[in-house]
């Protein structure tokens, strides 16, 4: 079915969960007033990104008052939100929730934690162990968190699991100059476009803005059609409220015109990956 999605390109305050929750609620109210069906927030929207030793201080259990409040807000609009999750055994995850009709439809824990260059996630966080598609009012979705999308297998697994829409939550820093754009922006635009085109799927990409410890996050949130075309894209380096009309007909047309997923041979892929795993284990 057709639906309207909002990409909430915000600038979270580092370590300030209460302030961020208030700002997030304001964006949700604005999206509901605009008659949107879904709102997508960036990675770690509730806490900010470069947390380091603050991780245990900002972590939330899924039954915390803050999460329960967001669940209640989802009775009027579907919500995707990034936060630091504390598990029952006191592990901390970079997680994302998909909330709909007053329930948690899906919880994704970031699998690939970057620990190079600017990034140090593995020092403070545990990694997730699965990629699973899930059903929503708007079809079958899959969620990825930033670095997850740079691993081809992640998007492929979700597509093979039936996802026709991929949501990627991101906290991508601005790096490099590429003509009139940023190198990091150009790289992400190529990645999201190629993923959508090869997997005949839609991509909703929500990236944050603002500064933390002198690092600037670049924004540029966008909706990419199954053809790989960017339908709408947010501003660079400043907050934005991007509204995207997601057309089911475009998905149907692209899958008829270029049936990549129909012709994908999952069993050959599994067979060859198993062969490689066996050979490496010798």
Residue ranges and their predicted role:
Residues 81-83, 94-98, 132, 221-223, ...:
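Short beta-strand scaffold segments in enzyme catalytic cores
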Residues 62-80, 146-240:
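CN hydrolase (nitrilase-like) catalytic-core segments centered on the catalytic cysteine
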Residues 1-7:
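Extreme N-terminal starter segment of soluble prokaryotic enzymes
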């Amino acid at each position: 079915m057709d639906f309207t999605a909002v990409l909430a390109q915000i600038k979270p305050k580092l370590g300030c969960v209460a302030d961020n929750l208030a700002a997030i609620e304001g964006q949700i109210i604005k999206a509901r007033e605009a008659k949107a069906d879904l709102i997508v927030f960036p990675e770690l929207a509730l806490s900010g990104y470069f947390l380091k030793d603050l991780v245990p201080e900002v972590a939330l259990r899924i039954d915390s008052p803050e999460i329960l409040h967001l669940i209640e807000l989802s009775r009027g609009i579907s919500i995707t939100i990034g936060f630091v999750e504390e598990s029952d055994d006191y592990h901390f995850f970079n997680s994302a929730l998909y909330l709909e009709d007053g329930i948690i439809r899906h919880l994704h824990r970031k699998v690939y934690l970057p620990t190079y260059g600017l990034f140090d996630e593995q020092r403070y966080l545990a990694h997730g162990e699965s990629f699973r598609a899930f059903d929503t009012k708007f079809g079958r979705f899959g969620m990825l968190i930033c670095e997850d999308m740079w691993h081809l297998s992640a998007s492929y697994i979700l597509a093979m699991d039936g996802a026709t829409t991929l949501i990627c939550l991101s906290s991508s820093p601005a790096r490099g100059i590429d003509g009139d754009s940023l190198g990091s922006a150009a790289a992400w635009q190529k990645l999201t476009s190629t993923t959508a085109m090869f997997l005949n799927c839609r991509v909703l990409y929500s990236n944050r803005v603002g500064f933390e410890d002198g690092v600037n996050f670049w924004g540029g949130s966008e909706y990419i059609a199954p053809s790989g075309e960017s339908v709408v894209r947010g501003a660079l380096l400043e907050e934005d409220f991007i509204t995207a009309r997601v057309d089911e007909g475009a998905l149907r047309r692209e899958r008829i015109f270029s049936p990549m997923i129909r012709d994908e041979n999952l069993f050959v892929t599994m067979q060859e990956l198993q062969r490689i795993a066996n050979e490496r284990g010798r």
